[in-house]
């Protein structure tokens, strides 16, 4: 689009040499140059990058099994957490999920956790422009962390902070809590550096297997012995702690441990 060049205008001196001295030359008239339109007016508002664009979401618990968000979904907010994947024993855990759902079906409507992992952070919120820098900080913090082979042991019942959901989980064997805490500490420091909430204190490392809506802690504790019998049929539940993952929305970063 070509911009119009608004020049100033003035009256010229008389070109007629015969003009008498009694005729006065008109005073110069200065016109102000009109202000050019701003770029936003011509080009429209700045468009977000494709990665930043997230449609406004109206949270409807009916669309995801009655779950409620712990924080409001807003454009530019990326739900973020750090975890260790439970890939080494995923087949055994999925078999337990199927058997437990069938066993408790008359009492509760249980849902399986689809991404089986051991959390090393709370779910926090990052802005899009923070993600890469946060990932680099986390990678640097974990550079000296050593991996190890661990196991899961038994079952335990948890609720979320709002007590709107109840979980059946397999805790980390107590023999490996100290080593897992050594990995957690630099992660907590990164969270602190970014003014984000640190992990629970005291930490309770576990892999969530099943969940249901509402506070069903009492009922599930009554069924815990029965559920443990299902898990006892499984071989040792191994957990390979050789890498840590960062999940930011649909982005996943992996950091190998020594």
Curated annotation (Swiss-Prot):
Q: Which of UniProt's keywords are assigned here?
A: Hydrolase, Lyase, Nuclease, Nucleus
Output the GO biological process annotations, alphabetical, semicolon-separated.
U6 snRNA 3'-end processing
* Localization of this protein: Nucleus
Which residues are annotated as active site? 117, 206
The residues the record assigns to binding AMP are: 117-119, 200, 202-208
TM segment ranges = none
Q: What is its main location?
A: nucleus
Query: GO CC annotations?
Result: nucleus
Q: What is its EC number?
A: 4.6.1.-
- For this protein, what reaction is catalysed? a 3'-end uridylyl-uridine-RNA = a 3'-end 2',3'-cyclophospho-uridine-RNA + uridine
Residues of the region (Disordered) are 1-20
Q: Which InterPro entries match?
A: Cyclic_Pdiesterase (IPR009097), Usb1 (IPR027521)
GO molecular-function term, one example from the UniProt record: poly(U)-specific exoribonuclease activity, producing 3' uridine cyclic phosphate ends
EC top class, in one word?
A: lyase
> For UMP, which residues are the binding ones?
200, 204-208
Show the SUPFAM superfamilies listed in the entry. LigT-like (SSF55144)
Question: Function, please?
Answer: 3'-5' RNA exonuclease that trims the 3' end of oligo(U) tracts of the pre-U6 small nuclear RNA (snRNA) molecule, leading to the formation of a mature U6 snRNA 3' end-terminated with a 2',3'-cyclic phosphate. Participates in the U6 snRNA 3' end processing that prevents U6 snRNA degradation.
Instruction: Please give the family membership noted in the entry.
Output: Belongs to the 2H phosphoesterase superfamily. USB1 family.
Any idea what this protein is called?
U6 snRNA phosphodiesterase 1
Recorded source organism is: Drosophila melanogaster (Fruit fly)
């Amino acid at each position: 689009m070509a911009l119009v060049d608004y020049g100033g205008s003035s009256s010229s001196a008389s070109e007629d040499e015969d003009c008498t001295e009694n005729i006065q030359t008109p005073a110069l008239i200065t016109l102000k140059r009109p202000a050019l339109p701003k770029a936003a007016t011509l080009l429209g508002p700045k468009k977000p990058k494709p990665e930043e664009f997230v449609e406004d979401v109206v949270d409807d618990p009916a669309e995801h099994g009655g779950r409620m968000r712990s924080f409001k979904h807003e454009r530019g907010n990326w739900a973020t957490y750090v975890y260790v994947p439970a890939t080494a024993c995923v087949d055994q855990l999925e078999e337990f999920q199927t058997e437990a759902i069938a066993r408790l079906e008359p009492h509760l409507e249980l849902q399986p956790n689809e991404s089986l992992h051991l959390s090393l952070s709370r779910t926090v919120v990052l802005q899009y422009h923070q993600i890469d820098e946060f990932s680099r900080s986390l990678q640097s913090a974990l550079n000296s962390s050593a991996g190890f082979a661990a196991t899961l042991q038994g079952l335990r019942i948890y609720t979320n902070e709002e007590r709107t959901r109840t979980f059946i989980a397999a805790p980390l064997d107590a023999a490996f809590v100290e080593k897992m805490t050594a990995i957690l500490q630099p992660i907590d420091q990164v969270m602190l550096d970014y003014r984000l909430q640190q992990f629970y204190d005291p930490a309770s490392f576990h892999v969530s297997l099943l969940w249901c809506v509402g506070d069903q802690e009492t009922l599930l504790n009554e069924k815990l012995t029965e559920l443990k019998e299902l898990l006892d049929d499984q071989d040792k539940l191994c957990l390979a702690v050789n890498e840590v993952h960062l999940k930011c929305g649909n982005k996943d970063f992996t950091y190998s441990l020594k």
